[in-house]
């Protein structure tokens, strides 16, 4: 039952069943265009499979379905508003629609990747409605309602297929990853204490950051499966923070050991070097370490080690509750209540603007070309431009996604012609034969989609789109060729636009992310208890993971970012003297650090960065004047020296 071939075949059956059910119910319920139901069932089922490279989890399919419903409703409302306001000016209607598509793409580039699909869909849904009802604008409300109904039917069929063919729960994968992360955390600490080679430590914490991020991303899929996982979800959210704290403490231990190798006693080092390959062995190891720490003088144990043991103990407690999904006891409730993560601010503003411009300009060019030439395939071409540019922008490689669409629509032409001209006309008298013929196509493509074959997803969607499954069926060969040609030209234009309008915001976004780490470090300089109690680790590591995705080969950037995260944690636990003058100076430093992020001029950025360094030097002197402890002055001095050393990378 768990053999890879069986799982691939099972998903292919799921996809075939979802498409066939949507087709049958669409005709049975006398929907005008069952094609939308079939297309929705195909995209909702196959899209997550293509992204995952295998059978998707049940939560992923339902999450995709909800996003499609939300995006469709937003797009329908947007389309209706545009038509009501500009019904007497068709050109203005079309241009406003292009502007709407660009704005939706811009928003989709700013929100979380998991939710971006809804806004991308909203952008081109309004365009589809306006283009389709261009000659009969008074029927737009009816068309919008019908489209929403067809979309919901397709999603219901996709979810039903997943439930019938053994839904794949993500819970077992979460349990396995929770255990793996704990073992890897212990191994990272051992590497940092030895200490091992930098490259080996880099690989270890890099892998841990990715796995911890993946574990946090699985929460939404788990909640989509069933509401009974709410307790698990709460525990996983805090477990994510504890895992990030473990990474930070281990890496800080490495930095401390690099400068002061004698800080850890030989006895403690021997205990930490003992092997532990399972969570049970690590549990026993934590017992020994807690007893040793309790019996030792507080100054004999480095703060990073005692903090690491405390975080690992909380991790073990939460992981047990995650595996059993038992009721939350009072100890766990205290841990859960103490976590208040801060939401991260997107650093992709410029990148999002470029994405919105790409979609808006490309769609407007397609629309103007259609109006100027009167080309019968112009509407389909324009819609395809909007679809490709909206959906491709949020992927790691937009050009690769656009190429996938282009290959898919080219392959869909002969396959669609075979179905439209020969197979479907031959099955007109039998719904069973029609369902079997379409089911076979879905089954074959369902296997290829899981292999992430170039063009597989585009072939499935484009073939369903051009064979025009309407009620009643009309076999107009010229209309078929126009639709197929419009798809091909639209995808080609989209690829050309992506190649011509280059996104040069990568370096700028990377610099902004690094300066956000600087801001987070200096923002820890505060005496406000509420601000000091905020949990910045999830937001900081989300930005670090984004840096990893953008610059996969630039290890120096990761080290700098991680060092700044460690600096933030050091300053956050430092007991800063409560003083009105120091508090006012804290605000001034934060304001300067924020200006380093927000200014667009390089010369001004250098000015504010130099001013930030000057203010940090003045702040150190103020701490000396107010007779602050050396434990307070030292972290500020380290941060200042680090910023001065790496200022070329930050400005």
Swiss-Prot record:
Pfam families found in the cross-reference section: FUSC
One example GO MF annotation: transmembrane transporter activity
Subcellular location, record wording: Cell inner membrane
Location, primary (coarse class): membrane
GO biological process, any: carboxylic acid transport
Keyword Membrane annotated: yes
Transmembrane portions of the chain: 11-31, 41-61, 67-87, 91-111, 119-139, 150-170, 368-388, 405-425, 429-449, 455-475, 481-501
Membrane topology field: Multi-pass membrane protein
Matches recorded under InterPro entries: PHBA_efflux_AaeB/fusaric-R, PHBA_efflux_pump_AaeB
Any Gene Ontology CC annotation: plasma membrane
UniProt keywords, alphabetically: Cell inner membrane, Cell membrane, Membrane, Transmembrane, Transmembrane helix, Transport
Origin superkingdom: Bacteria
Keyword Cell membrane: yes
PANTHER family attached to this UniProt entry: MULTIDRUG RESISTANCE PROTEIN MDTO, P-HYDROXYBENZOIC ACID EFFLUX PUMP SUBUNIT-RELATED
Family that this chain belongs to: Belongs to the aromatic acid exporter ArAE (TC 2.A.85) family.
Function: Forms an efflux pump with AaeA. Could function as a metabolic relief valve, allowing to eliminate certain compounds when they accumulate to high levels in the cell.
Protein's recorded name: p-hydroxybenzoic acid efflux pump subunit AaeB
Origin organism lineage: Bacteria, Pseudomonadati, Pseudomonadota, Gammaproteobacteria, Enterobacterales
